[in-house]
Amino acid sequence: MKDRRQLYNDFLKAFPVESLKNMTLEQYTDLKKDNSFCYWIEAKTSELGSIWGGCSYKFGVYEYQKRPKINDSRVISDEKYAWYSKYHKVTVQEAYDVVREAIIKIALYAQQGKWNEIEEISELGHSYKWKIAFMYSSELLVPIYKKEMLEQLALHFGMDNPAAKTM
């Protein structure tokens, strides 16, 4: 088991915030490599809070092994990638630009402790967005990304109606 702090630092070395604006689609999602941003967030750093499960839609844009069903209105796909139709983008690169901008905002807001601004970002899945925030927060966030789990924890420690609270 790798030291968690070392793992955290290894991620930041691989994806420093200043490099995000130049992160290519292939660096973001690549099924053949274990060094893509998505792979790091979901798999390599799972000891820093898991976001396993669910579908790949959480990444906004992803390279697929099996093409999504044509009748799934949530997703648009080409011969290699799929992305959310809610982005209203025709090409994967246009969709990826939306995703990359959201990641940059999340990372910068996390460094500044702007948690409410992160909560307002809707381009990415909830758990995925908060895992990214944790990874750029200087470990100021709790590495639990499922809102329901955080609410249960808050109840346990005596907070009244945590579901009604904001970050």
Identify what each model region corresponds to:
Residues 1-126, 137-167:
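An N-terminal alpha-helical hairpin/helix-loop-helix interaction module that forms a charged
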